[in-house]
């Protein structure tokens, strides 16, 4: 399943790359990418692991970029 998220307070591309590398290692994640302006993140993941994946994603984002927040993007 592919889901999109709004990303707030991500300060630079270097931190975004670090976040991408760590999230790619999370069990259940197939693919991740940030938009060019770093305000949106798209994650392709297994349906059965959405909750566990997103708990890790939020922790990774906040640890690498202090104050970074991730919110589900409703279509």
What is each PLM-predicted segment?
Residues 13-17:
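Conserved redox-active cysteine motifs that mediate thiol-disulfide chemistry
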Residues 18-23, 53-62:
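Short amphipathic alpha-helices in soluble, non-transmembrane regions
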Residues 1-10:
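Short glycine-/aliphatic-rich beta-strand segments at the starts of folded cytosolic domains
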Residues 20-35, 67:
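Short acidic amphipathic segments
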Residues 12, 46-51:
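Helix N-cap motif at beta-to-alpha junctions
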Residues 8, 42-46:
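Short hydrophobic/aromatic beta-strand micro-patches
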Residues 36-42:
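Short glycine-rich, basic-tinged beta-strand/loop micro-motifs
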């Amino acid at each position: 399943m592919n889901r999109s998220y709004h990303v707030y307070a991500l300060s630079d591309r270097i931190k975004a790359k670090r976040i991408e590398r760590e999230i790619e290692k999370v069990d259940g994640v197939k693919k991740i990418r940030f938009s060019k302006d770093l305000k949106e993140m798209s994650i392709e993941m297994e349906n059965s692991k959405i909750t566990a994946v997103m708990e890790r994603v939020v922790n990774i984002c906040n640890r690498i970029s202090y104050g970074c927040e991730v919110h589900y993007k409703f279509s």
